[in-house]
Regions:
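Chalcogenol-based redox active-site neighborhoods
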Residues: 1-163, 167-172, 179-186
């Protein structure tokens, strides 16, 4: 298994609407963008195997814990090829349990949602305001490698700013992670 370090790219732009989806969660419920009523919605493309995700998943759990569900809702989406090592629905359940995820974890086995967002790496976070307009696409914090300790909690600061009605300094600051494992065409 190889890890390809990938920077997120900018497909969605500031003020673009959040692309809709209907995806199954590890709780066997289906979720759509309309199900989330929070002031901020953080869609994060994650997976089960990537060292970058493993290093930052605790930060996402902590971030969700710091805000009420009416302020912030995080949604994890796994768009990796389910056949890839350590991926797939059953491994998502295991990953969620091992990391005490406190937010929905959804499977995008068609990979169409990742494509509609322009997600290319894991983690690849997209922060939307109350009307589901994109306000920020980018890193969770300033740690560039999994073993680094973050000094600046970029996403937390951005969530606070959005909740306070402030305009963000940056709307794009690329995330770094493993490439999404795309299905190969037959």
């Amino acid at each position: 298994m190889t890890m390809a370090k990938t920077l997120s790219s900018q497909t969605l732009k500031k003020n673009d609407n959040a692309p809709s989806f209907r995806l199954k969660g590890i709780d066997d419920k289906f979720y759509s963008i309309e199900d989330f009523k929070s002031k901020c919605l953080l869609i994060v493309f994650i997976c089960n195997h990537c060292p970058y995700v493993k290093a930052r998943i605790g930060d996402l759990v902590d971030l969700q814990s710091k805000f009420s569900n009416s302020q912030l809702q995080i949604v994890g989406i796994n768009s990796n090829d389910p056949a890839y090592q350590d991926e797939g629905f059953e491994n998502m359940i295991k990953f969620s349990n091992e990391n005490n995820l406190n937010f929905p974890y959804l499977i995008d086995d068609s990979q169409q949602v990742a494509k509609s967002y322009g997600a290319v790496c894991t983690p690849d976070p997209f922060l939307f305001e109350e009307n589901r307009k994109l306000v920020f696409h980018g890193k969770i914090n300033d740690a560039l490698e999994p073993e680094m300790t973050p000094q600046i909690h970029v996403m937390e600061n951005n969530v606070k700013s959005v909740l306070d009605g402030q305009t963000l300094e940056k709307d794009f600051d690329p995330s770094i992670g493993c490439s999404i494992k795309w299905k190969t065409d037959p």
